[in-house]
């Protein structure tokens, strides 16, 4: 009798190029390096009260079509140039989707959206798209879901997020402590702050853990700790973007002796999954800024070329989300201008 005990539930295995292979195949030039380095520094300056602008991470819930993503980026790059005096715009470029149960997990996992799971194609598409976006002079931000995929793209990422479902994970806290960009950590799906604040404290410190290098070797990695970590309020059972919630969050951050910068996600629990409700969230944030709030440093908006969302099918509408519903382009411009005006008027007071 064969008593097999190893990998008994692995039913398929396909080799994926090592990160260094794609990094060498699609290298970044000095202009892109300068953009990423500079944007990371600008976000850090905002987080540490040395730059009075607001940074705004805005874009599709998830990337499923690189053509529409690039068209969106072209439009957003123009807004970034127009409004850069008051707000620093970073495109939301999410390639991986955490799922509560099951579902499409994103461009890297299943780029053809047909359950063929061509991850080798997915990581290549992701890197190429990020380079194309950066060539427009537009920085990119993403969510980090695992410790392997960042090795393919982090040199082109200016800001990153640890999501509500992974904020309590030791692996993700260790990852955040070693990532080269500022990192936002979301409050839990129930709206609680503890997981995010504990995550910030952990990510601030050095960690030693097993990880993979760009050469795909397993190695002991020691991190320096990341002082550019901050909380993201994404709501929960109830929204938490209002003044009372922001003030109670500030109190909790002070008591924990971590960075007091707050980013507000206008979508998810704060919009109660209704994409049009992002607009009143942005209005509230703008009012709080106008009334002197110095701790709201960042905003996140889910937006696409066309509003709403659609179910996955063989004939997808161009420029519309296949995951969470997003606001359309016209509303996006209105919200960006509203936030920019709030910063501008606050300076004039």
Please name every model-derived segment.
Residues 55-68, 324:
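Conserved phosphate/anionic-ligand binding catalytic regions in large, soluble enzymes, centered on
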Residues 304-345:
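Internal helix-turn-beta structural module
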